[in-house]
From Swiss-Prot:
Pathway: Amino-acid biosynthesis; L-methionine biosynthesis via salvage pathway; L-methionine from S-methyl-5-thio-alpha-D-ribose 1-phosphate: step 5/6. It comes from Sulfurihydrogenibium sp. (strain YO3AOP1). This is Acireductone dioxygenase. The record marks D104 as: May play a role in transmitting local conformational changes. One of its GO terms (molecular function) is acireductone dioxygenase [iron(II)-requiring] activity. Binds 1 Fe(2+) cation per monomer. Binds 1 nickel ion per monomer. Keywords: Amino-acid biosynthesis, Dioxygenase, Iron, Metal-binding, Methionine biosynthesis, Nickel, Oxidoreductase. Catalyzes 2 different reactions between oxygen and the acireductone 1,2-dihydroxy-3-keto-5-methylthiopentene (DHK-MTPene) depending upon the metal bound in the active site. Fe-containing acireductone dioxygenase (Fe-ARD) produces formate and 2-keto-4-methylthiobutyrate (KMTB), the alpha-ketoacid precursor of methionine in the methionine recycle pathway. Ni-containing acireductone dioxygenase (Ni-ARD) produces methylthiopropionate, carbon monoxide and formate, and does not lie on the methionine recycle pathway. Belongs to the acireductone dioxygenase (ARD) family. The keyword Cell membrane does not apply. Its cofactor is Fe(2+); Ni(2+).
Length: 179
């Protein structure tokens, strides 16, 4: 399950309700949707194809619809990062750079795990997420993404525009999800 680790003092929060309560103060959404409804072969398949993607999105159709209606999102896709991903280290170098977005960064973890370090007040809080968990990092929040020791994650991403996201590293440097 999720875990918050505060870099300044090493404090750890592991209780899901405490995590949800703490993060909500800063506009970060945390929720648990679970993965029990997905067959293991679909969940664990990192060779993503259209059939696999459709099965995953259909399994979470209700939650995705509610999220879209509540937050104004319009589209979703599946993203996979693993040792099979071409140029994984290059992608991770980009994701590990501190940035923000003009839209929320929405991820539901289907399988695997990862870490979203987020700047909160004068600290950096590592938000560890695992399969079955939803994280929404709000627009404007300074953050980055890291794979953990498992080096794999499979997520549903949700967007407000068909173009997806644009990372803003500083005033003069951006990257889009297509870079």
């Amino acid at each position: 399950m999720a875990r918050l680790v505060f870099r300044k003092n090493g404090k750890v929060i592991e209780n899901p309700e405490e995590i949800k309560s703490f993060l909500s103060q800063y506009g970060v959404v945390y929720d648990v949707w679970g993965v029990d409804r997905l067959p293991e072969d679909v969940r664990k398949n990192y060779d993503i194809d259209e059939e696999n993607s459709k099965a995953i999105i259909q399994a979470y159709e209700k939650e995705l619809k509610e999220l879209k209606e509540k937050m104004g999102y319009i589209t979703e896709d599946i993203v996979v990062l693993s040792e099979k991903t071409p140029n994984l280290d290059g992608l991770m170098a980009k994701f590990k750079r501190e940035h923000h977005h003009i839209d929320d960064e929405v991820r539901f973890v289907v399988d695997g795990s990862g870490i979203f370090p987020v700047k909160i007040e004068d600290d950096i809080v590592d938000i560890h997420v695992e399969a079955g968990e939803l994280i929404v990092v709000p627009a404007g929040a300074r953050h980055w993404f890291e794979l953990d020791e498992n080096r794999k994650i499979k997520c549903i991403r949700v967007f407000k525009t068909p173009a997806g996201w644009e990372a803003i590293y500083n005033e003069n440097e951006t990257a889009t999800m297509r870079d």
